[in-house]
Curated annotation (Swiss-Prot):
It comes from Chloroflexus aurantiacus (strain ATCC 29366 / DSM 635 / J-10-fl). This is Methionine--tRNA ligase. The gene is metG. One of its GO terms (molecular function) is methionine-tRNA ligase activity. Belongs to the class-I aminoacyl-tRNA synthetase family. MetG type 1 subfamily. A motif ('KMSKS' region) lies at residues 351-355. GO terms for biological process: methionyl-tRNA aminoacylation.
Length: 600
């Protein structure tokens, strides 16, 4: 039976373009996972959008003399274009400034407040000494009072995992201007996390399939659980849905609270855009559906503790759709099944920093290099389980010595020879035991690679796919069909037929990782239709008349299936071209020079 799989992807913040470190953590792994499950025939809903509220966007707007909405509009388009060009197959990539998102966020706030899970507390708010604006917790750094780590943030210490408030930090400083923040008394609304402590602990304790760092970090976080502020003193954000705040512009819902709700609001928007307003329920109120969340390690607790607490408190909640059948009335919203957290990517041994020029933005990268080359590197050498470093030398080496030399070489030598000598899939003679064994080994890769992908072990899955491609290369080198054809055309045809069958199966195995080249290979092999695309943009008009663009795709029309090759004898091939480009080693010096130029 096909499964319902929700792929919930962290929302990139719309205060600037995204660099390759961002997509290494949230974008590429999620897309690989979603593509695999679609090929398996599962019902996938991959969702995200740009996170468009909060102080950082207002700071950019002030600097440029424009409005926060204008900044959000600009970077929503830039980020959306980048994700499209990288081939991230969202069912919907939307934004948090839509009327739909406001309505869903306010309904959840109101419901939690009415049930007593949102409380009011007097607290000390952090403000910038230079601008007077609220400083988000993550824009305040200082020394952790628990472990002494000197880059602890105002919400938590990434070194020891302690939950913090800005006032807890020793020598706190603003990341905006380096000055100590000014703390002023203010009233805020708080999510009463301790009310869910027992439920959360029991639930997380059962998630033995989570990555150990995610589970352990979450359990440690529960030890010091305390109410979490969900409002801030600012003008840019979702309005607080209580009567006394209807006409107030000085206090809004905190950006982190509305951002995680985006997973639900985006699902609801997708359903309405699809003409089936209740379709979201088959993912969110279906006990058999499984939810997978993808993000960087700095966002773990938002997805393992805070968002689950909100879902538990909301329960069956209100009614975001009509539900005419009454099937889902009283059915609670689904909790995460797995939270797939990536570590951090550095660049040339240093943290990414736009101000210091230590950065390569996605659009800049893709203007000079192929998307599949980046996707390959970020998977095979990315920060899946530990912090890793991107260097231009290693990127060029991986591209040339692995992607081009193994998979690219196999495809090129096979298709070029077959196209030249036969023009179509040749009729094979009797298969030898060696032939049969190779086909069986490659077909078995569908299970081994599939099992690894299903458990979010992307690096191991891609390594196994590359190993299988190398085995087919070894087979060709040993069988030498380019020599055999001179004396035994039938045997040569058989060898090339076996290679084509293996290449066709490997095409499917590589599709989640390398969708662009897999689609081209699909066409070179004489097939029609899409196995990996296309993506598209669509304009959506809301009830209030506003129009926004979403990234989407009609993935139901994909012809690819996670099955062994059924390549028909006699199918005409199309003239092949190399799948990948070999890079000149001078690229390394050129890119390092660009980085140096940005820094200066």
């Amino acid at each position: 039976m096909p499964e319902h799989i929700l792929v919930a992807v962290a929302w990139p913040y719309a205060n600037g373009p995204r660099h390759i470190g961002h997509v290494a953590g949230f974008g590429v792994p999620a897309d690989i996972f979603a593509r695999y499950h679609r090929l398996r025939g599962n019902h996938v809903l991959m969702i995200s959008g740009t996170d468009e509220h909060g102080t950082p966007i207002t700071l950019v707007a002030d600097k440029e003399g424009t409005t926060p909405q204008a900044i959000a509009d600009r970077y929503n388009k830039i980020i959306g274009d980048d994700l499209y060009n990288l081939g991230l197959s969202y069912d919907i990539f939307t934004r948090t400034t839509t009327a739909n998102h406001y309505a869903v966020t306010q309904d959840i706030f109101r419901t939690l407040y009415e049930r007593g899970y949102i409380i009011r507390q007097e607290t000390l708010g952090a403000f910038s000494a230079t601008t007077g604006r609220t400083l988000p917790d993550r824009y305040i750094e200082g020394t952790c009072p628990i472990c002494g780590y000197d880059e602890a943030r105002g919400d938590q210490c990434d070194n020891c995992g302690s939950q913090l408030d800005p006032t807890d930090l020793i020598n706190p400083r603003s990341k905006v201007d380096g000055q100590p923040p000014v703390f002023k008394p203010t009233e805020h609304f708080f999510l009463d996390l301790p009310a869910f402590a027992e439920q959360l602990h029991a639930w997380i304790d059962r998630q033995t399939h989570w990555r150990p760092n995610v589970r352990n970090f979450s359990l440690n976080f529960l030890k010091e659980l305390k109410p979490r502020a969900i409002t801030r003193d600012l003008e840019w954000g979702v309005p607080i849905p209580l009567p006394e705040y209807v006409h107030r512009d000085d206090k809004k819902i905190y950006v982190w609270f509305d951002a995680v709700i985006g997973y639900l609001s985006a699902s609801i928007e997708w359903a309405r855009n699809s003409g089936q307003p209740d379709a979201w329920r088959t993912w969110w109120q279906n006990p058999a559906a499984r939810h997978f969340y993808f993000m960087g390690k700095d966002n773990i607790v938002f997805h393992t503790v805070i968002w689950p607490a909100m879902l538990l408190g909301y329960g069956a909640g209100g009614d975001f759709g009509t539900d005419p059948s009454g099937t889902y009335q009283g059915v609670p919203l689904q909790l995460p099944y797995n939270v797939v957290s990536s570590e951090f990517l550095t660049m040339e041994g240093k943290k990414f920093s736009s101000s210091r020029g230590i950065v390569i933005y996605v659009n800049d990268f893709l203007s000079r290099y192929d998307a599949d080359a980046l996707r390959y590197f970020l998977t095979i050498a990315g920060p899946e389980n530990q912090d890793t470093d991107f260097t231009w030398a290693e990127f060029v080496r991986r591209n040339n010595d692995e992607l081009v030399a193994t998979w690219g070489n196999l495809v090129n030598r096979t298709l070029t020879n077959v196209y030249k000598n036969f023009g179509s899939v040749p009729q094979p003679g009797p298969l030898t035991a060696t032939d049969e064994q190779l086909i069986q080994e490659v077909n078995g890769g569908l299970e081994t690679v599939g099992d690894l992908l299903a458990t979010a072990r992307f690096k191991a899955a891609l390594s196994e796919a590359m190993r299988l491609a190398a085995q087919v290369n070894i087979y060709l080198s040993e069988q030498e069909p380019w020599k055999v054809i001179k004396s035994d055309r039938e045997r040569a045809a058989t060898i090339w037929y076996v290679a084509l069958r293996c290449v066709d199966t490997l095409k499917i195995i590589f599709t989640p990782f390398l969708p662009f080249s897999s689609q081209r290979l699909h066409e070179y092999l004489g097939y029609d239709g899409y196995i990996a695309g296309p993506l598209s943009f669509r304009d959506v008009t809301e009830a209030d008349g506003r129009v926004h663009r979403v990234l989407t795709g009609n993935y139901a029309e994909w012809v690819g299936r996670w099955q062994p090759s059924a390549l028909p004898v006699g199918q005409a091939l199309r003239q092949p071209q190399p799948l990948f480009k070999k890079l000149d080693e001078k690229v390394v010096d050129e890119e390092l020079a660009r980085m140096q130029s940005r820094a200066s």
